[in-house]
């Protein structure tokens, strides 16, 4: 197997296959569940809006893919600074049966100089999650400034995040190697049990390999696993399957 095919295989096993569109329906989520059970193995998770968790759970059980985790989003996509609402949404997501919750950090508050709200929001949402995995989306493409990306990562980890994630996929700039370098460095300094999730903008096996390479250089080859590394993506899967000669070439897309 070539290095590119190896990267494609790994990226599938590390993927949160995502649909977070305004026109999502039960049928689209059922299709996503089937798609997550690929000829190259299952993706790590699917990521969907909370209201679709029950139908996703039913579908994954029916197709024998119970090991695929169900992730959902809260305080999404704008990263508002109302802690009470973020906590209510997170509690509701857990009640729906989410295995993982991706919450958006109040990044605009941080840009305005307020570090407290972000820390307190993540801390409260982690308490609401209990054993459910909490991934914190810092929206690195909007923060832009390396110092802000670093600070959002530090605050999230200090507040109890299980993962830090680059992006919502709803802004012009999503995952970049530069943001990955900063965020993975913070993980190496603070807590190597915390995971990293580049989301949006990873289009093919070559780009996936670049992100994996940064993680391995900073944290070591043994660090990367579904417990510590995920790709958030929708259009990436078809490209990876094509690399593995398991699907036709994907059509050009503007998708996440």
Swiss-Prot record:
It comes from the Bacteria. The active site is at 102 (proton donor/acceptor), 165 (schiff-base intermediate with acetaldehyde), 197 (proton donor/acceptor). Keywords: Cytoplasm, Lyase, Schiff base. Its EC number is 4.1.2.4. One of its GO terms (molecular function) is deoxyribose-phosphate aldolase activity. Belongs to the DeoC/FbaB aldolase family. DeoC type 2 subfamily. This is Deoxyribose-phosphate aldolase. It comes from Shewanella baltica (strain OS155 / ATCC BAA-1091).
């Amino acid at each position: 197997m070539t290095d590119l095919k190896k990267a494609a295989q790994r990226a599938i096993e590390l993927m949160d296959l995502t649909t977070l569109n305004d026109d999502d329906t039960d049928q689209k989520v059922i299709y996503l569940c089937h798609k997550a059970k690929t000829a190259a193995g299952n993706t790590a998770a699917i990521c969907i809006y909370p209201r679709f968790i029950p139908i996703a759970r039913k579908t994954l059980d029916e197709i024998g893919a119970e090991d695929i985790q169900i992730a959902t989003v809260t305080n999404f996509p704008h990263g508002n600074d109302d802690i009470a609402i973020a906590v209510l949404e997170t509690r509701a997501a857990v009640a729906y049966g989410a295995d993982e919750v991706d919450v958006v950090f109040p990044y605009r508050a941080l840009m305005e100089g307020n570090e407290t709200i972000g820390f307190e929001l993540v801390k409260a949402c982690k308490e609401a999650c209990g054993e459910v995995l909490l991934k914190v989306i810092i929206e690195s493409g909007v923060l832009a400034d390396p110092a802000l990306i670093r600070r959002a990562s530090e605050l999230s980890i200090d507040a109890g995040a299980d993962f830090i994630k680059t992006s919502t996929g709803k802004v012009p700039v999503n995952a970049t190697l530069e943001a990955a370098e900063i965020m993975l460095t913070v993980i190496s300094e603070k807590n190597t049990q915390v995971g990293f999730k580049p989301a949006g903008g990873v289009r093919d096996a070559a780009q996936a390999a670049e992100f994996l390479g940064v993680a391995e250089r900073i944290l070591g080859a043994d660090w990367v696993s579904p417990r510590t590394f995920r790709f958030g993506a929708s259009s990436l899967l078809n490209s990876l399957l094509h690399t593995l000669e398991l699907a036709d070439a994907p059509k050009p897309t503007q998708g996440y």
